[in-house]
Design a protein with these regions (language model features):
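Extended, highly charged accessory segments
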Residues: 1-169
Length: 169
């Protein structure tokens, strides 16, 4: 847990783009199209940039233990299940808590952060109360369709950890 951490969110490329960065005219500040890149205007030199934004927020860094044997998809599922569990147990809106995958390509970790304006104190409460942290993990397990105590499949006819279970778009 880290209170008031500085978060930097980097936008590396266009969603459907292949190349990193964004080409802009250094005089106009306008983004350049592929057509404009083919015939550059010497009056408006082109520069490739990366866009970023930053914020200050409380964060909680979760490192799934290797013995879980989670694939990247498993860590992503855990990420969304933890977010959903926190939302439900703390009765907060989905926009008030967020998470990002971090770490190496071979071993991903989860960084949860409060995305509401100012601190809402949820992550601080979870970090300082091991019983609440355990409750979050138990709720996440339930959200994925299992009873932790009995290892029972709560919904045998439904897919586990489905879009409907984990996301709220």
């Amino acid at each position: 847990y880290q209170p008031a951490a500085k978060l930097i969110l980097l936008n590396k490329k266009w969603r459907r783009g292949k190349d990193d960065g964004f080409d802009i005219g250094t005089k106009t500040g306008f983004f350049k199209t592929k057509k404009q890149l083919e015939k550059p205007n010497p009056e408006d030199p082109i520069q490739n940039i990366m866009l970023y934004t930053y914020d200050t927020s409380d964060v909680l860094y979760v490192q799934p233990i290797k013995s879980l044997g989670l694939t990247e998809e498993g860590v992503v599922t855990m990420q969304y299940a933890l977010e959903k569990a926190i939302e439900q147990l703390y009765n907060i809106e989905p926009v008030e808590i967020d998470a990002r995958l971090m770490g190496s390509d071979e071993y991903k970790n989860i960084m949860l952060y409060e995305s509401a304006e100012g601190s809402i104190g949820v992550l601080k409460d979870i970090a300082r109360n091991p019983a609440k942290l355990r409750g979050i993990f138990l709720k996440a397990y339930e959200i994925c369709g299992y009873d932790y105590a009995t290892k029972e499949d709560l919904f045998p006819t439904r897919p586990k950890a489905s879009y409907d279970d984990l996301l709220s778009y």
